[in-house]
């Protein structure tokens, strides 16, 4: 079946599985980059505790780079899918070209931060000179060579918007394999390659990302024939850029809020470096689980957006129903794994002094995964139906308005010696349940105003 006919005619439940599985694998493999780095770094011969803490502190900026790339891609994904659903191939070409122009701007910003801002950022979270040195070296490499992850994210969404998510997954798998092969070689030093420690982990990561980006560029040029490829479409078009960000600026802010939340949590936990490291390690496991929901969201959004563009009320409703159902199934599996095997994850990272904090965080915070996954699915639905502001509100509730004040208040009692660090972890389930209730109310309103009103 042709790609355009598939988006129009294939039963939504089958289409979501066919598109969703490659996207889920792709997102999961993005999380693998950070897990693999931490696992190898945690088993270094010396300085592993400081190195793990350093990776925890740099993680918010890594997330922010991914967030801006993916956020720009998600908004362009919805707009491109809707435009193709309307049969407007010329506008689709402009959307694709302008997204690449925006990618170049994003890279320049990351490059400048990598050169001038990294050390000050790391120093704001710790006073340990070894951690500052390791974190600065790692993050500078990731920022200066960030064009790989930025353009991978953009080409990934271009392929997903046309229903070719399998090819984006192939590129991600190749990059992940390169990263996994290079990590022990460059961290520990094997053969002619010298031991580079944390720097080696950074180089392995960015090389894998660059390989993925190159491969997806080739796939995009060869396979995406629904619209023209020409550098003339990269010329900035104010109307297209405004339309992209009218849909997706809330999505970028939502993604960036994840980085802000982790950074502020690092500051809240600054009183205990072991708890700080434990949270950073757990967040990478949590990200792996929630990236399953993000991957499915990236199938939900173009399917519903395409259906919205062709005014198919039935396919929109099917997209909402199956999107939520499949998300819940994935999150139940994630909760089961993290609740049953916390000790095994701690051993993978060689968590050391952070072990008990890590296990405690995993057992408590993983309770929230089901509600967090539903919230992610809600946001994909909102974005497909021009509900960018609703998506932003859910993100603000989850990652700023509720979670940070709660964690800060709970930390006051922990620092006073009244109760253990586990109290802080309970802020996460409370936040996700509250946001899920609000998200359901938003969904009912959008369904009434956007879906039921279609002719």
Which residues does each predicted region cover?
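Transmembrane alpha-helix boundary and packing residues in multipass membrane permease domains
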Residues: 23, 27, 39, 78, ...
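Short alpha-helical transmembrane segments in multi-pass integral membrane proteins
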Residues: 1-20, 80-147, 193-248, 304-368, ...
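N-terminal transmembrane alpha-helices
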Residues: 7-47, 60-75, 79, 104-111, ...
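Short runs within selected transmembrane alpha-helices of multi-pass transporters and secretion channels
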Residues: 70-73, 142-160, 168-176, 201-216, ...
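Helix-terminus/linker motif at the lipid-water interface of multi-pass membrane proteins
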Residues: 28, 32-53, 122-129, 185-196, ...
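Small-residue hotspots at the loop-to-helix junctions and early N-terminal turns
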Residues: 49-60, 135, 139, 273-288, ...
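Transmembrane helical elements of multi-pass membrane transporters/channels
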Residues: 18-37, 141, 175, 208-212, ...
């Amino acid at each position: 079946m042709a790609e355009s006919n598939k988006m129009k005619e294939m039963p939504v439940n089958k289409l979501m599985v066919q598109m969703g599985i490659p996207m889920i694998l792709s997102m999961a493999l993005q999380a693998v980059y950070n897990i693999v780095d931490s696992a190898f770094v945690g088993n270094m011969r010396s300085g592993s505790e400081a190195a793990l803490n350093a990776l925890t502190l740099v993680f918010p900026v890594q997330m922010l780079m991914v967030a801006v790339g993916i956020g720009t891609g998600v908004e362009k994904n919805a707009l491109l899918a809707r435009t193709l659903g309307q049969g407007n191939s010329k506008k689709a070409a402009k959307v694709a070209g302008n997204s690449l122009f925006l990618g170049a701007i994003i890279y320049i910003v990351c490059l400048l931060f990598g050169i001038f801002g990294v050390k000050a950022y790391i120093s704001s979270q710790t006073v340990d000179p070894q951690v500052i040195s390791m974190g600065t070296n790692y993050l500078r490499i990731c920022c200066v060579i960030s064009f790989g992850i930025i353009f991978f994210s953009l080409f990934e969404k271009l392929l997903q918007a046309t229903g070719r998510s399998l090819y984006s997954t192939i590129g991600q798998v190749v990059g992940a394999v390169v990263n996994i092969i290079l990590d022990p070689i460059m961290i520990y030093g094997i053969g002619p390659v010298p031991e580079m420690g944390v720097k080696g982990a950074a180089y392995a990561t960015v090389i894998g990302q660059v390989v993925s980006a190159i491969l997806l560029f080739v796939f995009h040029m060869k396979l995406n024939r629904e619209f023209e490829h020409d550098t003339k479409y990269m010329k900035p078009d104010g109307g297209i850029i405004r339309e992209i960000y009218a849909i997706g600026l809330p999505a970028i802010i939502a993604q960036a809020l994840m980085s802000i939340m982790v950074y502020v949590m690092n500051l809240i936990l600054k009183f205990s470096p072991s708890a700080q490291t434990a949270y950073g390690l757990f967040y990478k496991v949590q990200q792996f689980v929630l990236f399953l929901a993000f991957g499915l969201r990236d199938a939900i959004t173009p399917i519903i957006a395409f259906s919205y563009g062709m005014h198919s009320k039935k396919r929109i409703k099917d997209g909402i129903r199956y999107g939520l159902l499949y998300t819940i199934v994935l999150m139940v599996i994630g909760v089961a794994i993290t609740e049953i095997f916390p000790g095994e994850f701690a051993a993978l990272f060689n968590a050391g002094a952070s072990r008990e904090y890590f296990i405690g965080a995993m057992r408590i915070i993983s309770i929230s995964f089901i509600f967090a996954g539903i919230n992610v699915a809600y946001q994909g639905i909102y974005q497909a139906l021009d509900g960018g502001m609703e998506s932003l509100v859910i993100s603000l509730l989850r990652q700023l308005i509720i979670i940070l004040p709660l964690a800060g208040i709970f930390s006051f009692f922990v620092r006073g010696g009244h109760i253990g660090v586990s109290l802080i972890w309970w802020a996460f389930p409370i936040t996700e349940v509250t946001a899920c209730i609000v998200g359901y109310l938003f969904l009912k309103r959008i369904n009434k105003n956007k879906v039921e009103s279609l002719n």
